[in-house]
Amino acid sequence: MAKEDNIEMQGTVLDTLPNTMFRVELENGHVVTAHISGKMRKNYIRILTGDKVTVELTPYDLSKGRIVFRSR
């Protein structure tokens, strides 16, 4: 799948789940389950409840996503 097929949205981390999964509320009000991207995991970027994040969603399953950026 090409990278431009993904949908990027802003959201807030609501809850931390096991296995580096997070429950994220998007700007439009939807709640999705998201995991950390490989580069964030490699660089030990910590994500806490309440952080503003950028989530990449695939058009095939809009209930799951990947956290690609944590805002300060």
Curated annotation (Swiss-Prot):
Q: Name one GO cellular component term.
A: cytosol
InterPro entries with a match to the protein in the record: NA-bd_OB-fold (IPR012340), RNA-binding_domain_S1_IF1 (IPR006196), S1_domain (IPR003029), TIF_IF1 (IPR004368)
Q: Which UniProt keywords apply?
A: Cytoplasm, Initiation factor, Protein biosynthesis, RNA-binding, rRNA-binding
- One matching Pfam family is eIF-1a
The UniProt record lists the keyword rRNA-binding: yes
Which SMART domains does the annotation name? S1 (SM00316)
Q: Which CDD domains match?
A: S1_IF1
Q: What is its main location?
A: cytoplasm
**Domain S1-like residues, every copy:** 1-72
Coiled coil feature spans: none
Where does the record place it?
Answer: Cytoplasm
* UniProt-recorded Gene Ontology molecular function terms: ribosome binding; rRNA binding; translation initiation factor activity
Query: Hey, which family's this protein in?
Result: Belongs to the IF-1 family.
Q: What is the purpose of this protein?
A: One of the essential components for the initiation of protein synthesis. Stabilizes the binding of IF-2 and IF-3 on the 30S subunit to which N-formylmethionyl-tRNA(fMet) subsequently binds. Helps modulate mRNA selection, yielding the 30S pre-initiation complex (PIC). Upon addition of the 50S ribosomal subunit IF-1, IF-2 and IF-3 are released leaving the mature 70S translation initiation complex.
Q: Which HAMAP family match?
A: IF_1
Q: How does it assemble?
A: Component of the 30S ribosomal translation pre-initiation complex which assembles on the 30S ribosome in the order IF-2 and IF-3, IF-1 and N-formylmethionyl-tRNA(fMet); mRNA recruitment can occur at any time during PIC assembly.
Q: What is this protein called?
A: Translation initiation factor IF-1
Q: Which organism is it from?
A: Photorhabdus laumondii subsp. laumondii (strain DSM 15139 / CIP 105565 / TT01)
Q: Which gene encodes it?
A: infA
